[in-house]
């Protein structure tokens, strides 16, 4: 290769492996990594699905699967920016759904429809953790509108939700 040969071309006419399409192509975002048993879990943000956030699982055998069927999307709006909005028990995934801020439960197999374990309310949930000793889900709860109609600021407190009967206590 002769490095002394110089070639001149007009601005913008050099061929490049980097195209505008390559730069602007939607790429998934990955965050909220957790390990559980022999599997890895993470949240995948999908721009090509309108920004839907899907909880993913990579099993010990290398199988990767979505755990949230459409239209469910993982996201919390507690403190306006959210927090860890999913937790794993031995058989179940608990997650906050973006559209209604309710906590849902679904099977770790990814089969079946998620079931809401909290009602429609002014409450938002984040930072979910499983308390295995007491069989409950602990979460930060943010209530908008407050218990008194004149309150402007959200009220924040911890809640415990029984994994056996889904009763919520403050």
Predicted regions and their residues:
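Multi-bladed beta-propeller domains
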Residues: 2-29, 59-82, 106-124, 152, ...
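Hydrophobic alpha-helical membrane-insertion signals
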Residues: 17-18, 22-59
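Conserved beta-propeller blade repeats
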Residues: 25-39, 73-93, 122-137, 146
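Short loop/turn segments that connect beta-strands within the blades of beta-propeller domains
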Residues: 36, 51, 60, 89-90, ...
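A flexible loop/linker signature enriched in serine peptidases of the S9 family
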Residues: 44-54, 74-80, 95-103, 118-125, ...
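Short, solvent-exposed loop/turn segments that connect beta-strands within catalytic domains
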Residues: 49-50, 135, 166-167
């Amino acid at each position: 290769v002769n490095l002394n040969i110089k070639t001149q071309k007009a601005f913008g006419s050099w061929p490049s492996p980097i195209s505008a399409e390559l730069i602007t192509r939607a790429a998934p975002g990955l965050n909220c990594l957790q390990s559980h048993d022999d599997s890895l879990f993470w949240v995948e943000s999908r721009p090509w699905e309108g920004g839907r956030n899907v909880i993913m699982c990579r099993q010990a055998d290398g199988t990767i699967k979505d755990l949230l069927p459409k239209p469910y999307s993982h996201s919390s709006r507690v403190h306006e920016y959210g927090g860890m909005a999913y937790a794993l028990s031995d058989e179940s995934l608990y997650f906050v759904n973006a559209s209604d801020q309710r906590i849902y439960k679904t099977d770790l197999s990814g089969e079946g429809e998620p079931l809401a374990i909290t009602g429609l309310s002014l409450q938002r949930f984040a930072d979910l953790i499983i308390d295995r000793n007491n069989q409950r889900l602990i979460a930060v709860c943010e209530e908008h509108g407050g218990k008194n109609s004149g309150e402007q600021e959200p009220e924040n407190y911890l809640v415990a939700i029984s994994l056996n009967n889904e009763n919520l206590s403050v």
